[in-house]
C-alpha cells in the first residue's frame, strides 16, 4: 500500500514537468514567429542589408591633397666634398732664423701680405759685398776704356803696335763681362734679401702655424711655415653615375651655366649655390662614376674645405607637370597607384606612371589629372569604393581621431 502511494506521486511529478516543458516550447515558438516579420522589415530598411548592415561604423579618417600643375626642376644628385680652390704650403726659400710671424691663425690674407721674416743680416752683408765688387769693376772698366781711347789715337800715328791695341780692346771686353757678372751677383743677393720677407702667394685663409719664432728654418723644410687655403672662391667635387653624363653634356650645350646647390649632411639645409665648373676626363671603372667640379663664391664662408655635402645640379625644368605629395604614391602588385577621392569622398585605386620625385613631391605623368584629390595618410585602411572622412593634417593625430581610427580598424570600412 505504501509502495503504491509513492508510485502515484512520481507519476504526478513527471506529468507536471512535461506540461511545463510543453508550455515553454510553445511560447518560444510564438515569440520567434512574431519577431521574424520585424527582423525582415528591418533588414529591408537597412541600406546595406544583411551582413553588410551589421558592419556599419565610423568613416575611416584620411588626409588628402590636390594634384596641382606646376613647373618642376630636374636635379642630378651626388655626394661630394668641399675642396679649396688652391692649397699652398708657405715655405722659406732661404735658410736662416725665423725672426717674426705677421699673421693670426685663421685670418684671411691677400696675395702679397707679409707673413714672416727671416733674419736678414747675412743677406744684407752678401748684397753689400756684391755691390762693392760691382763698383770696383765698374771703375776698372772706366780706366780700361780710357786707355783704349788713347791707344786708338796713338795707333793712327803708329806710336803703338796693332797687337797692343787689340790687347787693350780685349781687356775692355773682359771687364764689361765682369761687370755683367757683378750685376747678376747683386741681383741674386737682393733676391735673397727679399726672400727673407715671406709673403702670401695667394688670397685665402691661413691655418695653424707650423713653426715658432726663433727656430732655424731652411728651404728644404717640408712642413713649411703655414698652409693657406683659398676659400673665395671654393670648389665642390662630387660624383655622378656614368648614365648621367649624356644629360649633363646636353644641358651644357644649351649654353647656360648649370646651377649646383650644396646641401648639408642631412640634406635638410641649403648651404650655398654655385655653378658647374668642369667634368673629369675619364670614368672611374671601379665605381662607374665620374667626378664633377662646381665652384662657389662662398663670400659668406658657408662652405669649408673637406666638408661633406650633398650636391644637387639643376639640368632641366619640366613645365606643366602634375604634382602630388610623395606620400600619396603607393606600390602594389600591378605597379604604382594612388587612392583618388571623388565628390562623395569615396576612394578608388588609380594606376599611375610616376616621373621626377623627391622626399616631398612626385610628378605623375599618367593616371590622374590636375585637380584630382589623392589620399596622403590613412592609406593602409582603404578598400575600393570605401567612403572616408577627410580630416585636416594638423588634427589628424588628436586623441579623438586616434580613438575613431582604432574603432574603425575593429569594425571595418563603411561603403
UniProtKB/Swiss-Prot annotation:
Location of region: Disordered: 31-60, 392-415
Superkingdom, natural source: Bacteria
Entry keyword set: Cell inner membrane, Cell membrane, Membrane, Signal, Transport
Induction description: The mdtABC operon is transcriptionally activated by BaeR.
GO cellular component: efflux pump complex; plasma membrane
GO MF annotations in UniProt: efflux transmembrane transporter activity
Compositionally biased residues, Polar residues: 31-47
InterPro entries referenced in this protein's UniProt entry, alphabetically: CusB_D23 (IPR032317), Multidrug-R_MdtA (IPR022824), RND_pump_MFP (IPR006143)
Signal peptide boundaries: 1-21
Gene3D superfamilies, sorted: 2.40.30.170, 2.40.420.20, 2.40.50.100, Helix hairpin bin
Statement: the UniProt record of this protein carries the keyword Membrane: yes
One Pfam family from the record: HlyD_D23
Membrane topology value: Peripheral membrane protein
Compartment(s) of residence: Cell inner membrane
Keyword set includes Transport: yes
Complex and partners: Part of a tripartite efflux system composed of MdtA, MdtB and MdtC.
Protein family (similarity comment): Belongs to the membrane fusion protein (MFP) (TC 8.A.1) family.
Function per UniProt: The MdtABC tripartite complex confers resistance against novobiocin and deoxycholate.
Identification of the protein by name: Multidrug resistance protein MdtA
Native species: Escherichia coli O8 (strain IAI1)
